[in-house]
C-alpha cells in the first residue's frame, strides 16, 4: 500500500503491548504528553531496528484511535480536549482555559523581536501572575514574549541541532545497541521539545512536560544532562573505533 509493505500480523505483538502500556499511562497518569513521548520513542526505536515504515504508520494510527476513543469516553480527557479546542470560550477562559489563553496572549504580545529580555510582565501589582507557571510549563511563552519570534526560532534551532547530531551519532555507531541507544535518547529529547512547545503554541493539548535545559526542575535537568552524556559516550566510542587501526 503506497509502497509500504505490511508485515505479518504476528510481528505486531510488541507494538500492541507497548500501545496498551501507553493507553494505560493515559488513563492512570492522565497525561497525554508522557504517553505520546513513551509511545513515540518506541516507534522510533522500532523503525531503526526494523527499517519498516509500516510499523510507524500503524503505530500512529493506533495511538490516534486510542486517544480518540478515550477522549470520547473519559470525562477528564474530553475536558482537556475541549480546553485545547477553544480556551477562549465563555466560562473556560477564566478557569481551565486561563493557562493556555494567557500563553497565547503573551506570545502574540512578543511580536517579532520581543519586549526585551527580562521585561515581560509576569506578576500583577496586587498579587497573582499573568502567565501561570512561567518557570516550568509556560516558560516557552515567556521566551517568545521577551525574545519574540526571532529568539523563539533560535531556541528551536538549537534543539533541532541537538536532535540532528543525536540521530547522526546513531548512524555512526558501530554496533546495534549503540545505534538503538542513541536513536532512542534523541527521540525522547525531540519529543519532549515537541510536546511542550506544541502545547504552549496550541498545536496539541497542553501537558506538564518540561522544556529541556530551560524549565525549572532539578531532576529534569539532571536527566537531560545524563541523556547528552550518553550520546557523547556513544559518539566518542564510534570515533575511537573508526580511527583505530
What are these model-predicted stretches?
Residues 1-99, 137, 141-199, 226-230, ...:
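Hydrophobic alpha-helical transmembrane segments of multi-pass inner membrane proteins, especially
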Residues 37-38, 118-126, 158, 201-210, ...:
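Re-entrant/interfacial helical elements at transmembrane boundaries that shape
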Residues 112-150:
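Long extracytoplasmic/lumenal interhelical loops at the membrane interface
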Amino acid at each position: 500500500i503506497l509502497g509500504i509493505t505490511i508485515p505479518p500480523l504476528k510481528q505486531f505483538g510488541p507494538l500492541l503491548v507497548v500501545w496498551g502500556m501507553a493507553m494505560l499511562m493515559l488513563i492512570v497518569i492522565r497525561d497525554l504528553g508522557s504517553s505520546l513521548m513513551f509511545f513515540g520513542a518506541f516507534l522510533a526505536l522500532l523503525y531503526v531496528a526494523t527499517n519498516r515504515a509500516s510499523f510507524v504508520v500503524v503505530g500512529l494510527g493506533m495511538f490516534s484511535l486510542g486517544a480518540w476513543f478515550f477522549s470520547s469516553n473519559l470525562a477528564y480527557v474530553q475536558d482537556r480536549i475541549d480546553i485545547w479546542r477553544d480556551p477562549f470560550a465563555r466560562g473556560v477562559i477564566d478557569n481551565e482555559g486561563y493557562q493556555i489563553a494567557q500563553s497565547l496572549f503573551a506570545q502574540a504580545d512578543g511580536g517579532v523581536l520581543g519586549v526585551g529580555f527580562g521585561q515581560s510582565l509576569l506578576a500583577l501589582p496586587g498579587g497573582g501572575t499573568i502567565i501561570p507557571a512561567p518557570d516550568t510549563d509556560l516558560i516557552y511563552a515567556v521566551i517568545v514574549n521577551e525574545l519574540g519570534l526571532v529568539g523563539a526560532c533560535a531556541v528551536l534551532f538549537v534543539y533541532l541541532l541537538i536532535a540532528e547530531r543525536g540521530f547522526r551519532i546513531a548512524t555512526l555507531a558501530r554496533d546495534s545497541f549503540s545505534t538503538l541507544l542513541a536513536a532512542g535518547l534523541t527521540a525522547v529529547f525531540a519529543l519532549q521539545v515537541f510536546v511542550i512547545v506544541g502545547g504552549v503554541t496550541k498545536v496539541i493539548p497542553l501537558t506538564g512536560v518540561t522544556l529541556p535545559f530551560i524549565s525549572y526542575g532539578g531532576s529534569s535537568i539532571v536527566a537531560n544532562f545524563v541523556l547528552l552524556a550518553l550520546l557523547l559516550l556513544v559518539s566518542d566510542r564510534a570515533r575511537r573505533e573508526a580511527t583505530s587501526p
